[in-house]
């Protein structure tokens, strides 16, 4: 974005600021900082430096996108919104925008530069300010202008959240009474993805056998032993039920810890993706929290992301059980007929106890 902004003549390239903040960020890229195993006092410096770097990087990209936006043709019928895709691949995904609207609209109409009506949803309206969701499709490293105005919302009408179930054109998801995912049925392939009686769930191991490094050392016998499901004070509600995005909210507790999850499907975006957003107030001590996915897919090996590559690993063994994976892991059937990929934002420890999990 900064290169484009400079090319258009609107902004000098911020090389000094980028170098300074990149070096500040790299200062803390080593194992004690990243894994949370430094002494508590050191994190006074770590958090401060990371927050400064993050804030200044955000300012840099916001300033650059703003400079480019001012150079674009934003003459549209409604309120113009510029969407920037910073990655080197095309994207079609849900965008959240805040726009001015004098009156609360009954619906939202979003139009692309090509005149295509995009799926959209009104989240809220208060005091002339509307929060809107819409689907944007943007080429790699590119900018696109969209028009937002009151109007009829484009929808297939096949997105629904109710009574612990969530459904779109591809999946039907059912939760059990504990708030765990008991079923994911792929309607297009006529296939159940969750093992019968073994839901996708949060699980906790409370036996910590490490005496030297209890903050990070994990024993295989602990992972092979009993686990606790998070099932206290379960509340399942519908968080969203719009034409573009629908979500179930699951709230649970365990002792002093509180767990809130949002399970989300879309209609008109990346509809084959199930999103689970976690908001945890973790007060546990001497405990390990994991998410478990017992699938109906079988393979002795799973594939793990390494950032610039990938690696295949087998089931847990005595000297390799808690393993590294960056942002995704994939389990594809032996005959390559079907597969599931689990993407995650910031947790890099995985284990594979059997062919299906």
Q: What are the roles of these predicted feature ranges?
A:
Residues 55-58, 62, 66, 70-357:
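C-terminal (or distal) subdomains of carbohydrate-active enzymes
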């Amino acid at each position: 974005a900064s290169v484009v902004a400079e090319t258009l003549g609107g902004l000098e390239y911020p090389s000094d600021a980028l170098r300074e903040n990149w070096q500040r960020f790299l200062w803390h890229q080593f194992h004690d900082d990243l894994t949370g195993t430094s002494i508590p006092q050191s994190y006074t410096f770590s958090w401060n430096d990371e927050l400064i770097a993050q804030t200044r990087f955000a300012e840099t990209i916001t300033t650059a996108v703003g400079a480019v936006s001012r150079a674009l043709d934003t003459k549209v019928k409604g309120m113009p919104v510029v969407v920037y895709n910073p990655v080197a691949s095309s994207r079609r995904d849900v965008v959240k925008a805040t726009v001015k609207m004098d009156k609360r609209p009954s619906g939202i109409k979003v139009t692309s530069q090509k005149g295509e009506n995009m799926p959209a949803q009104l989240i809220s309206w208060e005091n002339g300010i509307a929060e809107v969701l819409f689907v944007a499709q943007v080429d790699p490293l590119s900018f696109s202008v969209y028009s937002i105005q009151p109007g009829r919302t484009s929808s297939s009408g096949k997105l629904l959240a109710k009574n612990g179930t969530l459904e779109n054109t591809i999946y039907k998801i059912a939760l059990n009474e504990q708030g765990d995912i008991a079923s994911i049925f792929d309607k297009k392939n006529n296939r159940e993805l969750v093992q019968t009686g073994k839901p996708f769930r949060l699980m906790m191991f409370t036996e910590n056998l490490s005496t030297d490094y209890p903050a990070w050392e994990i024993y295989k016998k602990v992972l092979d032993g009993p686990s606790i499901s998070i099932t206290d004070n379960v509340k399942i509600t519908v968080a969203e039920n719009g034409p573009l995005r629908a979500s179930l909210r699951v709230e649970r507790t365990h002792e002093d810890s509180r767990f809130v999850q949002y399970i989300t499907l879309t209609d008109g975006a990346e509809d084959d993706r199930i999103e689970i957003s976690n908001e945890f107030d973790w007060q546990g001590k001497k405990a390990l929290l994991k998410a478990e996915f017992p699938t109906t897919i079988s393979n002795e090996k799973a594939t793990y992301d390494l950032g610039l590559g990938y690696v295949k690993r087998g089931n847990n063994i005595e000297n390799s059980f808690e393993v590294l994976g960056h942002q995704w892991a994939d389990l594809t059937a032996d005959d390559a007929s079907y597969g599931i990929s689990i993407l995650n934002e910031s947790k890099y420890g995985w284990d594979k106890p059997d062919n299906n999990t």
